[in-house]
Amino acid sequence: MALFRKKDKYIRITPNNSLKGSVSHNVPEVPDELFAKCPACKHMIYKKDLGLAKICPTCSYNFRISAQERLTLTVDEGSFQELFISIETKDPLRFPGYQEKLQKAKETTGLHEAVLTGKAMVKGQQIALAIMDSHFIMASMGTVVGEKITRLFELAIEENLPVVIFTASGGARMQEGIMSLMQMAKVSAAVKRHSNAGLFYLTILTDPTTGGVTASFAMEGDIILAEPQSLVGFAGRRVIETTVRENLPDDFQKAEFLQDHGFVDAIVKRTELRDKIAHLVAFHGGGQ
């Protein structure tokens, strides 16, 4: 009877070992550098769609950009003259791994230190300019960063120039200990001398501006601008919540929150910063 008929066995096929891995070689790979994930809206974005300003087309999030990219966006073409290149970072505490970390940062960013300093023209207005780069050890402020910015203010006093600084930092550089913390007072003293000379100082807070930089020259500008949604603060959110034992607002330490509470004069879109800088410099006496 069919009910008790023995079922036929399946045919067994032995895989050919020579074919193993051949399929994977034929699958096209998508290069990692083609796309970027927006930290805000989580969308995957074709990098060319970000444009030169690197702004998310979906939610307008401002990606972090390098000092060189910001220079291209801000100053007149061919006008930038870099200064204080020869100042070298030392290792006063002989901190383990510090020299290796510095070398890697130099190779990755193409910078000598976490800040780019020099003179430039912005729509015909000459300025003394500093741009901090968070890709270089999170733009932490060590002795060289402090020295370069101090010298920039001293040069600006001698040449009667306004100073414009794009800030970005994770704070003082722990590998240099108290020498790093001293830069806060040193740069602030230079800012004061520049102010006493009747010269204009403009700061633009970018993401992130925290720690000792926030507690010193970042918040000492005659006018303080900020890019949208930039993180700006001193201590970290969790540290503050633990200390005060309260839950902080969701937008706490965002540029918009600081503007609402009088710490920032205006939030300016990245694509509009060049025009805004030129206007403010011209309005406050210019840098001809």
Curated annotation (Swiss-Prot):
Cofactor field: Zn(2+)
ZnF (C4-type) ranges: 38-59
Keywords for this protein: ATP-binding, Cytoplasm, Fatty acid biosynthesis, Fatty acid metabolism, Lipid biosynthesis, Lipid metabolism, Metal-binding, Nucleotide-binding, Transferase, Zinc, Zinc-finger
Protein localization: Cytoplasm
Any Pfam family the entry gives: Carboxyl_trans
GO biological process, one term: fatty acid biosynthetic process
Binding annotation for Zn(2+): 38, 41, 56, 59
GO cellular component: acetyl-CoA carboxylase complex
InterPro entries reported in the protein's UniProt record: AcCoA_carboxyl_beta, Acetyl_CoA_COase_Trfase_b_su, ClpP/crotonase-like_dom_sf, COA_CT_N
Subunit structure: Acetyl-CoA carboxylase is a heterohexamer composed of biotin carboxyl carrier protein (AccB), biotin carboxylase (AccC) and two subunits each of ACCase subunit alpha (AccA) and ACCase subunit beta (AccD).
Family: Belongs to the AccD/PCCB family.
Alphabetized NCBIfam families for the sequence: accD
Name of the protein in its database record: Acetyl-coenzyme A carboxylase carboxyl transferase subunit beta
Annotated organism of origin: Streptococcus pyogenes serotype M3 (strain ATCC BAA-595 / MGAS315)
Taxon lineage: Bacteria, Bacillati, Bacillota, Bacilli, Lactobacillales
Gene that this polypeptide is encoded by: accD
